[in-house]
Regions:
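Ligand-binding clefts of soluble mixed alpha/beta catalytic domains
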Residues: 1-520
Length: 520
């Protein structure tokens, strides 16, 4: 006897699973301009690398003890490769109950499912392709009881954040648990216009708050990405979102016990760009393009910006020097003169923590007059957020290298280096430093003296000029209070040499990052 009948049933069940929620719902998904979950997995992974797990799970119909039909579970997951490296991948099937969770004995994925277990045990990155509404209130009719939300299994999501890279793409309307899972990632991206993110959707908002809003008004990318910063990046299409995930992972090790991957670079480490000698205006009040400096210093076309539309007075992203991954943190003088507010501080702190976890050295490009000031900045908690970012930076164990391009003042300037470990600081001739800018600082420190004269404006100018005469960066270098003054054109060669030299130390940092106490 053979098992031919059972093998035929297996093939039948597989074919039904491949049809997802049926032709009509698949066509509707396509009409909305969105891919199905199986198409998404195929698009984000290397060709023919996907091995599905749990394909037969679903809500089956039986008649007289014989299998009749099955509605697939609204989640597809398995093992695949991105750029030849293994990843765990999974996502909601919106064509089956809108991607809401299924009442299975064991979760396939989502919060605390098999796919998360696979990422943890195999120590491989986790890729979440998210489009779903989370819990389905109708499930109580079948179960005959209401369960506690603590069973949603976010514990595994939390564990993964300390072990392997986690990337998430929000690809359609997403609420509840899937929305929380999108945020519990190291990198997230959402499709503008097609995807929305919220804790609860419009029907719940209307019932609870008596407000009518559309999904886009509630949680479109203009909210989730640009204003709230809940999601890191926006994308114009699903294809672009997948490309961003692939690119993000290209800088990451597979887990915290590995170093980031080195790629072969044809960009000479000795490349010196003439434009760097003139890019900073002699007028210290005029802004310039920091992103242009980034493009000239780091390996060509290697900069991958993270959160470009949130916290716009700062710039964060991944790049390479001589093929080695580095994290770039820069001030943006085109926005608020580069002064970080609470949003910028949260952005920089999160990014530094990411780099520290995955053993990626940090390069700071500094032009900061201090933290953003004024009533609005104080009301949004800029000081506390700034100190939180400083706390993260001070406990980071990765090497850091600081290039002071122009201003470096106050606590925001101090955020860019540490005194308890090696921190190589090099300044351009355009650099200026201090605990507080001369403008405003003199008026505060010499208030009585200035007001007691018959010509306060003239005395203010005299004191400012006297202090400014001591502000040459060469005086600071004479005291070895800054390690080097360099020709701006030497920035890339210097950084390349130090990043390469740091690789031996990086090998001593592998493993999870210990907790550093309670953040401010």
């Amino acid at each position: 006897m053979t098992w031919e009948l059972e093998i035929k049933e297996l093939e039948l069940r597989r074919q039904k699973a491949l049809k997802l929620g049926g032709d009509e719902r698949v066509e509707r998904q396509h009409r909305l301009g969105r891919l199905t979950i199986r198409e998404r997995i195929e698009a984000v992974l290397d060709r023919d690398s996907f091995t599905e797990v749990g394909q037969l799970a679903g809500d089956a119909e039986w008649e007289n003890g014989k299998f009749k039909d099955v509605a697939p579970a609204p989640y597809v997951m398995g093992l695949g490769k991105i750029d030849g490296r293994w990843v765990a991948v999974g996502g909601e099937d919106f064509t089956v109950r809108g991607g809401s969770s299924a009442g299975l004995a064991r979760r396939k994925g989502g919060q605390g499912g098999f796919v998360e277990d696979m990422a943890k045990e195999l120590l491989i990155p986790m890729v979440n392709l998210i489009e779903g509404s989370g819990a389905n209130v109708a499930s109580a009719l079948k179960a005959k009881y209401k369960r506690l939300p603590a069973r949603d299994g976010f514990e595994r999501c939390m564990e993964l954040l300390g072990l392997v890279p986690v990337a998430a793409a929000v690809l359609g309307p997403t609420g509840g648990g899937p929305a929380g899972r999108a945020v519990m990632s190291h990198f997230s991206v959402m499709v503008r216009g097609a995807a929305q993110l919220f804790a609860a959707g419009p029907p719940v908002v209307e019932r609870a708050l008596f407000k009518k809003v559309t999904k886009e008004e509630l949680g479109g990318a203009h909210i989730a990405v640009d204003k709230a910063g809940s999601i890191d990046n926006g994308a114009a299409s699903e294809a672009e979102a997948f490309e961003q995930i692939r690119r993000f992972l290209s800088y990451m090790p597979s887990n915290v016990w590995e170093l980031p991957p080195l790629v072969e670079s044809e960009d000479s480490q000795d490349r010196c760009e003439e434009d760097l000698a003139s890019i900073v205006p002699r007028n210290r009040l005029k802004p310039y393009d920091m992103r242009r400096i980034i493009s000239l210093v780091f390996d060509r076309e290697s900069f991958f910006e993270i959160q470009p539309t949130y916290g716009r007075a700062s710039i964060t992203g991944l790049a390479r020097l001589k093929g080695f991954p580095v994290g770039v943190v820069a001030n943006n003088p085109l926005i608020n003169a580069g002064a970080p507010d609470a949003r910028d501080s949260n952005k920089m702190g999160h990014f530094c923590e990411l780099c520290d976890l995955f053993h990626i050295p940090l390069v700071f490009l500094v032009d900061v007059p201090g933290f953003m000031i004024g009533p609005e900045a104080e009301a949004m908690g800029t000081l506390r957020a700034g100190m939180r970012a400083m706390h993260i930076g001070m406990k980071a164990k990765v090497p850091r290298f600081t290039v002071i391009i122009r201003k470096c003042y106050g606590m925001a300037g101090a955020l860019t280096f540490v005194n308890n470990r090696l921190c190589y600081r090099m300044a351009w001739p355009s650099a200026e430093f201090g605990s507080i800018p001369i403008e405003g600082g003199v008026a505060a420190a010499f208030k009585r003296e200035i007001e007691s004269t018959g010509a306060p404006d003239r005395r203010l100018s005299e004191i400012e000029e006297e202090i400014r005469s001591y502000s040459s960066p060469f005086r600071t270098a004479e005291a070895f209070a800054v390690e080097d003054i360099i020709d701006p054109r030497e920035t890339r060669p210097r950084l390349c040499r130090f990043i390469e030299a740091a690789q031996g130390y990086l090998r001593t940092t592998i493993g999870p990052v210990p907790l550093g106490g309670v953040r401010p």
